[in-house]
Every structure is written in structure tokens, then in C-alpha cells.
Amino acid sequence: MKKTMLMFILSVITSFSFIFSQALPGTLNWYNGEGNGMFTEVAYKKILSKKKSTTVVVAVIDSGVDVEHEDLNGHIWVNAKEIPGNNKDDDGNGYVDDINGWNFLGNKKGENVDKARLEKARIVSKYQSIYENGDAAKFANDPMFKLYQEAKASVEADKEQFAPYMEMIGKGMFDKETEEYLKDQMEYNLNPAFDDRSLIGDNPDDFNDKFYGNGNAEGPDALHGTHVAGIIAAVRGNNKGGDGVADDVKIMSIRAVPNGDEHDKDVALAIRYAVDNGAKVINMSFGKGFSPNSEKVQDAIAYAASKDVLMIHAAGNDAANVDEVPNFPHKPLVDQPSNLSRLMFLNIGANTKEKGKKMVADFSNFGAIEVDVFAPGNEIYNTVPQSEYKNLQGTSMAAPMVAGVAALLKSRFPAATMMDICNAITSTVKKYPELEGLCNTGGVVNVYNAAMALEKKFK
């Protein structure tokens, strides 16, 4: 669950990639409404409520999900082939007691990783002894040396930016949450010496070592993942928090995102787990600037695309142009021959309910090539652990909007492939001049328009 440096420097109080605020009466479901919303309710009323429904499984690769949340009741995936608590791999998939998903951030003892380093700190730790004690000229043509130099410079720059704020800790200038964030950055996220993997006991560079972790689909900090799950699947019409976008969906919780940067291996295996266990949509509300094993993640993305699984990814919260600044994982590049993978991987920017220039969320990444569509990601009121609700914002919230739309459309048009669903979503956006040049469609996802397009194709 990456927390964004830029957001912190710009405003200490809004330093997180998802931001707390209070829900306002009458705005709980603005994202499903008209205006800058997705016209979800119109689609239900005029088209979708009249059609039979088939349940769709959506994998949420995230920090974990509170599978007992009151507003997710009936919408959590259950592995019917697995017998709970018998400590056996009943279905033979290699994962023991994976009842509601899998946790790649734990061990067989039931212990779990919470905090982790940023990837750039891991790179510094791994290569420092090699490159710092050698002749720089000797490594001039070594691509890992270049990666190490970039990672080291970035870590040092971040520490320098944080230094003035660290001096203010304990002086009553910050609230408890902000102080904890600052301490986490220095003690864990930006600390090359912090070991975030020994508890798990695997080799994070050995992608053939697959069967680690445990069946705890919630983990120690499921706030982010639970909110994401609620946007997709919260019970509709019960006046408990915001309504989920989809009404006939099961959430498969795959825990692979700590408080820090996710490991490439965990992401790649999480994608493959989702595909192999029946998910048709995968939501990925995370990202990072360095990815030393990105080709392995690309292989997993290609595998998902080959199985007709649609991947939805948050564009990121650095207010940056991702055509120029990498945000991993990403779709295959334009000049690479993996066209199917590129088409089946959507990057999502975040819009607000405001008009004009304020329509684009000030934190949202953008890109005329790499970002596909925008979706509501500001002031989103939905589920958090312990059957509670909070208002959060970020492209982390925009991505599950689109994942929910994809699941909803697939549930009503089961004959459609996920490629059909993807094309319907991207070709029917509601265009806004404010989004021209910020994404390749120039618009916000519109459920009603997409449903009409599919209705014509699959009568």
C-alpha cells in the first residue's frame, strides 16, 4: 500500500495515496450517479435490472480484505473445493486452506508482514556491497549498476526531503497518524537495512518457489483492500455506506501489498493465482517506481490476457505523466509485440465530482498513451475493517470503480468475452475537454453507454 512522497511534501496532512475525509450527506453514491459519475444507476434502471445475472469473480490484489464486513456479506469468494481448517491442500492447487484467497505476505506459522521497504531501498541493499567497493568504470555497461545508481539517488533525495519534518516529531506539530507515517518512512520504507522478507522465508528472486504464505486473506492492515473491495461489491441499497458498483460479484482476496512496496514475485504469483482460481477481473490498486523483475510480472500479465482475464490498474497518485515516468506494473510498451496484453490491461486515472479544471483529481497521474480512462476517485465513502466506513480518495479508489463496471457488465452479458467488455468500456466513455490529452480515450467510464453497446451486440 504505497504512500506517496510527493503528496506528503505538498501537504503533510494529505500525505497518503488514499486520504481520509468526512462523508457529506447526499454524496455517498455520487460515483454511481450522473454528472461526473459513471451513470451506474441509470444503467441498472434502464437496462441491467431487466437482465438475468451470472456471478463474476473479481480478484483484489491488495493489503487484504475484511471478509466478515457486514456490507460485503454474500460477496466474498469461497473456494468450495477446500475444507476450512484441516491444514490440507484439498483442491491440489498448492495452497493450503485458501478459503477466501491467499496471503503471499505471511508464513506457515500464521505470521504476517505488514511494513516493507520501498523497492529502491531493496535495490540499494542488494547491490551496495558490489558496486560501492568496485571501479565505476568497470560497471559502465552493467544495466543493474545504472538501476542501482538511480535507486540510491532516489533514496537519498527522499531522505533529504523528509529530514526537516523528522526534526518536528514530538513537538506537537503533527497528529499521531502523520508522525507514524514519517517514522515508517525512515525506519522501514527508506531503510535499506530493514529486512522485510525473512519472516516469509522464501527467495524473492526465485519465481519457481511459489507455495509460500498462508490462508489469512485479511492480514494485519486491511483498510485499503477492504475499501477497494467495497467499491466493487458492497451490498447495494441497504443504506450502509456507499453502494458497490456490481451486484452479483464475489471478491477473491489476494494479499500481496504491504505498507511499502510490493515484491514483483508476489504480484506475478498473485495474478497467476487469480487466473487459475476463476477470477475474470483483477484489480490492482498499487504501484511503484522501480521493478527489477518486471519481465516476470509482464509474463503473468500476458498469461492473464491469454485466459481472457481483464486487469485494472491504478495509474498512481504522484500527479505525474506516466508516459514519461514509470509506474509499475504497467502494460507492455507500445513498440512491444504483446498487443493482447496491452489491450487487456487498463490504467485508471481519478476524477472528482467538481466541474471544470477541478474535475481532474489533483493527485492523479495521467498520460495520453498509458492511461486509458478516468473514473471517480475523490471522496469515496465505503467499507473499512470492523464493519465501519470511511471516505478515502486516490486512483486506488478509481481502479475498483472500473473493475466493478467490468464485473457488472460481464454478469449481465455472460456471452461477452472480457475483451468485449473492455472494448465496451473504453469506446463509450463520456468525453470531457478537461481530460483531453490526459488519457487515450479522453473520458470517464459510463456504465449506461457501455451497457447499451453490449445490448446491441448481444441481443
Which positions does each model-derived feature cover?
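Positively charged n-region of N-terminal signal peptides that target proteins for export
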Residues: 1-5
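Short acidic, glycine-rich surface-loop motifs adjacent to enzyme active sites
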Residues: 23-28, 117, 135-153, 159, ...
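C-terminal subdomain of the subtilisin-like protease fold in secreted/lumenal serine endopeptidases
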Residues: 275-277, 281-284, 295, 341-347, ...
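Extracellular S/T/G-rich loop segment that most often corresponds to the catalytic His/Ser-adjacent loop
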Residues: 309, 331-411, 415, 419
